Amino acid sequence: MLNIKFIQDNPGLVIEKLKKKNFDASGIVSEIVDLYLQKNKLQNQSDQSKAEMNKISKEIGILFREGKKEEADAAKERTSELKENIKNFDEQFSAIEEKVYELLVQLPNLPHDSVPFGKGAEDNEVVKKGGEVPTLQENALPHWELAAKYNLIDFELGVKLTGAGFPVYRGKGSRLQRALINFFLDEARNAGYEEIQPPLVVNEASGFGTGQLPDKEGQMYHVTLDNLYLIPTAEVPVTNIYRDRIVDAKDLPYKNTAYSACFRREAGSYGKDVRGLNRLHQFDKVEVVQIAHPDKSYEVLEEMVKHVESLVQKLELPYRILRLCGGDMSFTSALTYDFEVFSAAQKMWLEVSSVSNFESFQANRLKLRYRDENSKKPQLAHTLNGSALALPRIVAAILENNQTPEGIIIPKVLVPYCGFEMID
C-alpha cells in the first residue's frame, strides 16, 4: 500500500509513475487528495470546537461561583452543542478514512525508475543469458511424453483424483522432485537463510498483507467454510511472520527460506503453453524472503538474483534473466527480475523464478517497521522475495534437455540427492 502522505505531497508523480504499469491513477489520486482536503477542513473545525469547549468548561465553574446561574446554564448548553459537533466531526473523519483506505488498496506499487515501459511479456528486457542450448536428436520428446515413457509423472491419474493441473509423481519422478527441494533448501541455508516450515493455508489478513488480496482473490483457492486461503506461494505466510512488528534496524536483514506446495487456480489459462508441467494448479517451490533496510534493499535484490542464478548454473540449464516491463509486473512489485530456462524439446523459454523488491508497499500493509537510533519514530522496512526455485518447469527442462537414446542424464549436483545418475 502506498504511503498516504507521499500521495498528498506528490499526486502528479504518482499518476505519472503508475502509467508505466498501464494504470490510470488520476481519478483515485484526485479523490484521495480531495478527501484529505475535506478532512483537514473538518479537523480545523473540530480543533476550534474543542478549544472553545475547553475554554467554556473552565468558565462554567467561575460563573457558578460568582452566582451567574443563567450564564452558567447557557455555557453548559453551549458545551453540549459543541460535544455533538465534535461527535459529528469524528463520524465524518471515520467515513473519510474508510473511503481513503478503500481507494488506497486499489493503487499498485510504484515501479522503480529502471523499469522499462511495455504492455506485456514481449516488452520485457533481457539483461543476461547463460548456459548452452543443447542440440537434441530429431525425435526428441517433450517432457510429458518422457514422463509417460519412464513412468515418472501420471497426469491422467491426477485428473482422476482431483482434476487437470494436479499431477501424480511416482518412482524416480518423485525422487527427482524431492532431490530438487532438498538441493534448493540446502543452497538457501548455505546462503544464510533460516528455514521455515509454514502452514499451507492463511487467513484473510495474511493474504492482504502481501498483496494477494484483494488483487488476486480470483486466482486463490478459498476455503469458504473457515474463510481461509490455500497459499499461492510461501511468500505469503513467511512474510506475514513479520506482520505488526517493530524490529531493530541492527538485526536487518532477516533472511528466511521455505519449501511449500503452492496452489493457484490459473483461471483463463489454456492452449499449448499449459501442457504437462508448464502450468499447474498445485506445484512445489522453494521461496527466499528478506526483510531489509530501505538503504540496502536494492543491494539485497542483486544478492538474491545472484543466488537464483547460481542454482540454474549448478543445474547446467540454459537460462536468461529479464527485467520485467511495467505492464508485466505484479500489483505489489517495484522491480522484478524473471528467470527463464530453455526447454529444448518444446523450443521455448519457461519461467522458473521471479525475484522482486516491493520496497515499503507490503510493509505498509503489514505494519512492519524498524527502529534505529537516528529516527524519532519507527520507519517502514522493505520486503523482497524470490522463487529459488519453482520445480515443475525445472523438471521439464531437465527431462527434455538431458534426454539421450539411453535415457535421461541427471545433473551432477543432484546425483547425491537422487541416488541415481540416469533415468532409463
Briefly describe each language-model feature range:
Residues 1-134, 148, 152, 156:
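N-terminal alpha-helical targeting/anchoring segments
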Residues 26, 129-424:
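TRNA-recognition modules of translation machinery and tRNA-sensing kinases, especially anticodon-binding
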